[in-house]
Amino acid sequence: MTNSFQNSRRDLRERAFQALFNIEMGAELLAASQFAYGYDKVTGEDAQVLELPIFLLSLVTGVNNHKEELDNLISTHLKKGWSLERLTLTDKTLLRLGLFEIKYFDETPDRVALNEIIEVAKKYSDETSAKFINGLLSQYVSEVPSANKS
């Protein structure tokens, strides 16, 4: 497999999504992060010593540590009749990741974080889900003045 990842922030967001998804399936945080980052970069023993980018680790550990808070925020922005349990794991993971970056990464403008997670959503989900994620995160950004870092 050729390495299509370039260590850009978008690529690292995508790898963070992959790691978070694997954590939901029972993987340990560091192992999931190492696999998501290195599965197409190195083989054998070298994979054990691969240094993970700070941005990737910050996203994965941050979402993992704030999962309950993020889930509560997502739940409060769902339309009547919807619950967190009704969302697919893919959409939940994307929402958590996008919301975490919007809420906690001051150096990333909200609109950038929003647009980036939509691009990841288009790759791993369908167009309807990408629009749903865009709508929910846009609603959060518009309601929370401190979130509008753009």
From Swiss-Prot:
Keyword RNA-binding: yes
Keywords: RNA-binding, Transcription, Transcription antitermination, Transcription regulation
One GO location term (cellular component): cytosol
Transmembrane segments: none
A GO MF label: RNA binding
Organism domain of life: Bacteria
Biological role: Involved in transcription antitermination. Required for transcription of ribosomal RNA (rRNA) genes. Binds specifically to the boxA antiterminator sequence of the ribosomal RNA (rrn) operons.
Protein family according to the UniProt entry: Belongs to the NusB family.
Record-linked NCBIfam families: nusB (TIGR01951), PRK00202.1-1 (NF001223)
Protein name as catalogued: Transcription antitermination protein NusB
Source species: Streptococcus pyogenes serotype M49 (strain NZ131)
The encoding gene: nusB
